[in-house]
C-alpha cells in the first residue's frame, strides 16, 4: 500500500464527520484512520477499508472502579506554603494554594508515616511529637518566632492531569476522569481484565495506541488563576510515588526514601538538577516496574492479533525510549508529538519498528 502518494500517513477521524474524513483520507493518501482523545469512529469509517487505530489511556476512564476502590488512585508528595511563626504555636493547612479539584489529602495511617514537618529557616526536621494533625490542619508547637515552617505530605491525585488540562483549557463539561495506580494489586488485576475485554469488543481495531502508560509527567495546578501552573516538569518522577512504592523500594534497596527526597527544600527534583544517588536508584526502580507491567499489556494486545504503539508524551514517565528497559517491552511503534527537530530525533533514534510524528 505504500507508495509516493499513499501510505505512512495516519488521519484523525470522528463520528459525524464521515464524508470529510474519507475524502481527506483519499486526498492525502492515508492508510490508517484513528480516533482521538474524546472522539469515536463510526462504522462507516471503520468499515471503509483502512487500518483502524484506536487510542487508549490505560489508567483513566475507570471512574466507577475508582469510586469503589479509592485506595487504588495515584498519589504524590506535596509541600505546604511556608508559614512564618509569630508565636509558639503555628497552624498550617497543607493544601492551601493547591487546586482543590486536583488533590485531596491522604491522611491515612499508612500515608501519615511519611509526612514531615520542617523548620526551613533552620533546615531541620521536627520530631513527630512537635506537631499534631486533625481535620485538614497541622498544628505546630514550640515554634521559634519568625522561623518559616512547612509540611511535606502525601496527597491523592483525584483528577487525571491531561483530562484536567483539556477541561480547564477547552471548557469541557464531562465528568472529571480519575487515574489508577497499577502498583495496587486490585487495580492491576482490573486493568488487565479491562484491556482483554476491550480487545474482544473492538475487533475492527488493528493498532492500539497506548496514551501512554501509567504515570504522567508532573503538572501541579494552583488555586490562584494567575498562578494556575505551580510546577510542571516533563520528566519528573514525583507522580509515581505511593506508600506501596516506597515500601517496595526499601525492601529492595535496603534503605528508606523520605518525603524530603522528593520535596528537596521546596525545590523539588526538577529534571535540570543533577540527580542525587537516591533519585537515580528510584528512577531505575520505577523504570523496571513500568517495563514489566507494560510488557504484560503488550502481550495481551498481541494475543488478540493487534499491534501496540505507545505515545511518547503524557503518562510516559518510566518508559524512557533511550533507557535500559524500553526495548524489552516489545512495542510495535512509538509516537511523538513534535515541536522541534530535537523531538523528531528523540523519536527517530528509538529502538522500535515504527516511528510516528504528530
Question: Model-predicted segments: where are they?
Answer:
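Catalytic domains of carbohydrate-active enzymes, especially glycoside hydrolases
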Residues: 2-4, 9-55, 194-211, 326-336, ...
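Hydrophobic or amphipathic alpha-helical targeting/insertion segments
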Residues: 40-87
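Hydrophobic anchor at the start of a short beta-strand
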Residues: 52, 308-309, 354
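Active-site core of glycosidic bond-cleaving carbohydrate-active enzymes
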Residues: 350-358
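Polysaccharide-binding and catalytic clefts of secreted carbohydrate-active enzymes
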Residues: 75-332, 339
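Short low-complexity, flexible loop/linker segments enriched in glycine and/or proline
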Residues: 46-50, 67-71, 223-225, 322-329, ...
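Surface-exposed amphipathic alpha-helices with a cationic face
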Residues: 26, 42-49, 294-307, 348-350
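Conserved beta-strand termini and adjacent loop/short-helix elements that scaffold enzyme active sites
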Residues: 55, 311-313, 357
Amino acid at each position: 500500500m505504500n507508495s509516493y502518494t499513499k501510505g505512512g500517513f495516519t488521519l484523525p477521524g470522528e463520528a459525524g464527520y464521515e464524508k470529510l474524513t474519507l475524502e481527506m483520507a483519499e486526498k492525502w493518501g492515508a492508510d490508517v484512520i484513528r480516533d482521538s482523545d474524546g472522539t469515536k469512529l463510526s462504522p462507516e469509517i471503520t468499515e471503509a477499508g483502512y487500518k483502524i487505530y484506536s487510542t487508549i489511556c490505560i489508567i483513566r476512564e475507570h471512574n466507577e472502579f475508582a469510586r469503589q476502590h479509592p485506595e487504588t488512585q495515584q498519589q504524590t508528595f506535596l509541600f505546604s506554603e511556608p508559614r512564618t511563626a509569630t508565636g509558639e504555636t503555628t497552624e498550617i493547612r497543607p493544601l492551601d494554594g493547591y487546586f482543590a479539584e486536583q488533590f485531596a489529602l491522604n491522611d491515612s495511617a499508612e500515608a501519615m508515616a511519611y509526612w514531615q514537618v520542617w523548620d526551613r529557616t533552620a533546615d531541620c526536621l521536627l520530631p513527630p511529637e512537635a506537631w499534631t494533625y486533625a481535620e485538614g490542619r497541622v498544628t505546630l508547637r514550640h515554634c521559634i518566632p519568625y522561623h518559616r515552617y512547612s509540611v511535606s505530605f502525601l496527597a491523592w491525585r483525584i483528577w487525571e492531569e491531561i483530562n484536567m488540562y483539556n477541561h480547564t483549557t477547552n471548557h469541557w463539561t464531562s465528568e472529571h476522569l480519575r487515574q489508577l495506580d497499577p502498583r495496587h494489586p486490585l487495580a492491576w488485576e482490573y486493568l488487565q481484565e479491562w484491556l482483554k475485554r476491550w480487545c474482544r469488543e473492538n475487533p475492527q481495531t488493528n493498532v492500539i495506541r497506548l496514551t501512554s502508560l501509567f504515570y504522567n509527567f508532573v503538572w501541579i495546578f494552583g488555586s490562584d488563576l494567575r498562578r494556575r501552573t505551580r510546577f510542571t516538569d516533563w520528566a519528573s518522577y514525583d507522580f509515581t510515588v505511593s506508600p506501596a512504592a516506597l515500601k517496595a523500594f526499601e525492601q529492595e534497596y535496603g534503605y528508606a526514601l523520605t518525603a524530603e527526597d522528593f520535596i528537596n527544600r521546596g525545590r523539588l527534583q526538577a529534571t535540570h538538577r543533577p540527580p542525587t544517588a537516591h533519585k537515580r536508584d528510584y528512577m531505575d526502580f520505577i523504570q523496571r516496574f513500568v517495563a514489566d507491567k507494560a510488557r504484560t499489556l503488550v502481550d495481551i494486545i498481541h494475543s488478540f492479533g493487534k499491534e501496540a504503539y505507545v505515545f511518547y508524551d503524557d503518562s510516559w514517565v518510566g518508559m524512557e525510549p533511550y533507557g535500559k528497559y524500553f526495548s524489552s517491552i516489545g512495542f510495535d511503534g512509538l509516537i511523538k508529538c513534535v515541536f522541534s527537530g530535537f523531538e523528531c530525533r528523540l523519536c527517530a533514534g528509538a529502538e522500535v519498528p515504527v516511528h510516528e510524528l504528530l
